[in-house]
């Protein structure tokens, strides 16, 4: 049996509060606080409510369906998949306000520790590139060969032919992956933007795509890193370089 069983879905009027620890807005519903995807603090929305049962426990999540009172910081999300794949949470929020929300979230977390309450939090360093920066993608593969993402709330599979966050090389590889029907349900694609090195796992046995590499190499500020397939590596290479330069300065 699927670990996550959908019980029912409905619609409700919600008044959105703060951003929660998972990145979604928080709203009160039936006496409890729930996460609502696609909102901005202060908005009044009609949301689609999803009730789930997981391991004998009940959970409730929501997705904005209609905005009644819109925030001044709301913008049109540039990605056609936004809201369906749920990989991006804040494309509907003006970028400058995104940075303010991130800073506020860090301050809120620090307040939970007496030893960190007085620590001064600097403004968030804006990314030089809001799109085409990710050096790592993990795609889901359906039996019919379609490649894409799974909506984290509805668990519905969303076929994707282009992801605005990924480097052009990863998107080119994504196009090649469509409909080759590999014998796997997950594919990991990684790319070194400063070296041109790449990794596709698992081995696909397809001549058009080099795959099965155990690692790839990336250059950060003159330092070569050997990144294994399961290893963590900062997905925004340019920001990682800027961070290392700040630490060393």
Tell me the role of every PLM-derived stretch.
Residues 1-249:
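Accessory RNA-recognition modules of RNA-modification enzymes
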């Amino acid at each position: 049996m699927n670990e996550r069983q959908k019980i029912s879905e409905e619609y409700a009027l919600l008044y959105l509060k703060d951003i929660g620890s998972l990145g979604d807005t928080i709203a009160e519903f039936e006496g409890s606080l729930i996460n609502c995807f696609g909102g901005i603090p202060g908005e009044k929305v009609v949301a689609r409510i999803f009730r789930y049962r997981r391991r004998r426990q009940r959970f409730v999540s929501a997705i904005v369906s209609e905005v009644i009172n819109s925030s001044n910081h709301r913008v049109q999300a540039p990605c056609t998949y936004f809201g369906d794949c749920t990989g991006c949470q804040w494309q509907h929020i003006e970028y400058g306000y995104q940075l303010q929300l991130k800073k506020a979230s860090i301050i809120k977390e620090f307040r939970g520790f007496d030893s960190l309450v007085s620590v001064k939090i600097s403004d968030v360093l804006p990314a030089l590139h809001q799109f085409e920066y990710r050096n790592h993608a993990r795609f889901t593969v359906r039996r019919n060969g379609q490649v894409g993402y799974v909506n984290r709330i509805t668990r519905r599979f969303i076929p994707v032919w282009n992801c605005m966050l990924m480097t052009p090389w990863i998107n080119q590889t994504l196009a090649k992956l469509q409909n080759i029907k590999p014998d796997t349900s997950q594919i990991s694609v990684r790319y070194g933007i400063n070296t041109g090195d790449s990794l596709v796992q698992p081995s696909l046995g397809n001549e058009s795509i080099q795959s099965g590499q155990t690692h790839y190499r990336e250059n950060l500020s003159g330092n070569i890193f050997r990144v294994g397939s399961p290893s963590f590596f900062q997905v925004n290479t340019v920001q990682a370089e800027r961070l290392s330069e700040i630490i060393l300065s």
